[in-house]
Amino acid sequence: MTDAGEATPVAELIASLTRQVPDFPKPGIQFKDLTPLFAEATAMTAVTGALARHASGADLVAGIDSRGFLVAAAVADRLHTGVLAIRKGGKLPPPVHAERYDLEYGSATLEIPADGIDLRGRRIVIIDDVLATGGTLAAAARLLRRTGATVTAAAVVFELGALGGRAALAPLPVHSLTCQ
């Protein structure tokens, strides 16, 4: 099912190639492993094509560390735009723009380079593999907005609807290719 609640060929393809891993990374979590989906050329083409339709009009695509990089780069290529890697804290040399956010147990940081890239006025779509609670995507949107960028939407391959990630991102439009 998509974010519109409809079964599509892309949603069915995602469902058929998503590996369910129980109790990972901790007990009670049902991890969605999209590696088989990304490794299948036809599926990757279908997924990036669908995400590119949601990202049209952007002049930059931002992917979140790390699986978001895989999809964002392919979407940017389709749209003939650049791609920006939003990194986990401590992975980039200074200076950086950073945004801290809370996790279930602790906190984390996202970073982008502070030099060499002018994001003021850029229309950016943020891409990631999975939307769960929305904390990471919300932090990415705040980070980009602080640099003067206009975040136009977020797009994900897989949404865990019961975790309420859309609410954390409101009023930002969120597009998911499949929702469970």
Curated annotation (Swiss-Prot):
Family matches, as InterPro entries: Ade_phspho_trans, PRibTrfase_dom, PRTase-like, UPRTase/APRTase
Cellular component per GO, a single term? cytoplasm
| Keyword Transcription tagged | no
Asked if Nucleotide-binding is a keyword of the record, the answer is: no
The pathway it acts in is:
Purine metabolism; AMP biosynthesis via salvage pathway; AMP from adenine: step 1/1
Record's subcellular location: Cytoplasm
Please give the SUPFAM superfamilies that the UniProt record associates with this protein.
PRTase-like
What job does this protein perform? Answer: Catalyzes a salvage reaction resulting in the formation of AMP, that is energically less costly than de novo synthesis.
Question: What name goes with this protein?
Answer: Adenine phosphoribosyltransferase
Q: To which species is this protein native?
A: Mycolicibacterium paratuberculosis (strain ATCC BAA-968 / K-10)
